[in-house]
Amino acid sequence: MHSALRAVVVGISFATLLSASPRATAQAFDWHKYAGTRITFLANNNPVANALVKHKDEFEKLTGIELKVDAYQEQQMRQRLVTSMNARSSEVDVFMSLPSREGLQFARAGWYADLTPYLANAVAPDYDAKDFSPGLVKDATVDGKLIGVPLNLEGPVLYYRGDIFKKCGVALPADLKDMPALADRLKKCEPDLTPFVSRGQKPALPFTYSVFLHNMGGSYMQDGKSALCSPAGVASIRLYAGLLKDYGPPGVVNYSFYQISSLYKAGRAVMAFESSNELSTIMQGGAREGDTNVAVLPAGAGGSHPTMIGWTMAVSNYSRHKDAAWLFLQWASSPAMQKKLALEGIAPPRVSALRDPAFTAWADQQPARRQWVAALDQLSRTGTAEVGYPIVANPASREFIGQAVNDVMLGSRPAEQACTQADQSLNDLIAKE
């Protein structure tokens, strides 16, 4: 296992909210205290939740709690959550959340239950809260309150067909600006395959596009204003949109992780820039095990600044079963469960899972797994959680970013016009903060 990844995970000091947890672990802990209770988990139908839900029966046997799982695609999950929360409904007890996206917004709306008291007073002896990545705990802390527990760490990585690269006599470029030339050579060499695919769906694409922006030296805001029309911003929009327009699949404006992974897994794409979470999905069935390589996106004029975030599991502030819900969070994020999920390709937020000999042996079984771990190591050391604008209205900001990229991708507007319109709308959002 890569020592740098471990160092990043353990090397940062923890917030004081974690320091209280060892006192609580000495107390008697009863997993059956809320037996007979029924809780509802609103889940994103992604690899993290899918891997976790496979073990649902283990949680129910341990606690006697009935777990109802409502799983949706990410956009539909959030629509369901917003409807429930706006109605102050108690129908959702636990939900998945991305602090980098909605943390500030949901916290200010009062939708998260504060988990700080639970972490201080209601943890099992073997929970070990200090085992979590400090950076992920920091991301899940808003105004001094813990809004969720980390489930994973992830970021976009480049999956690519080593066998096709060898056949076509190409290699990954050292500079991001040379990606179109690579895609063009692949298109000429293998005209029946899609050279490059990544996210085109408006609310989803900032996750992958942000790496292009940051690697080319751009940022979303400068001096309190939107900076999408900076020279680096314009260049990054042109590059990202151009790759998908000229070398992506038909209908790519509707692509998110599901369509991308399906296309690559089926052997119809040579390169796929998508979440590290998708490793297990892509490798499922074994067709890609022998021909896939994994790497971070090439650096650009601004260096290498990959996206690095993590999903959390949160308790609804309107739940009538917060104590039972906390048991589910604790079980899902426990050292034992995280070690199991790591063996299914879910990068763990706990150092104990990273150090586990079983995980090391699992990674060593395939070259792609070793490369995946190396890529996560680099994401950990150099990554940023800035996906969209660092404002309460982050989710809305992503729509405007996506619209600007889509306009260029579809040929509706040149990059300069698309980003100018986006900057105007984004500055209006910023002014409301």
Where are these regions (language model features)?
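Hinge/lid segment of periplasmic solute-binding proteins
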Residues: 27-33, 100-155, 208, 291-295, ...
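Short, polar/charged alpha-helical segment
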Residues: 28-30, 46-66, 401, 419
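Conserved C-terminal helix/tail region of periplasmic/extracytoplasmic solute-binding proteins
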Residues: 31-34, 38, 66-67, 166, ...
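C-terminal lobe and pocket-closing loops
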Residues: 33, 277-289, 300-400
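Short, well-ordered beta-strand elements
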Residues: 35-46, 65-70, 93-94, 194, ...
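Extracytoplasmic "Venus flytrap"/periplasmic binding protein-like
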Residues: 54-131, 167-174, 263, 267-271, ...
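Extracytoplasmic/periplasmic solute-binding protein
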Residues: 139-151, 156, 180-226, 269
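Glycine-centered hinge/linker elements that transmit conformational signals in sensory
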Residues: 183-185, 224-253, 297
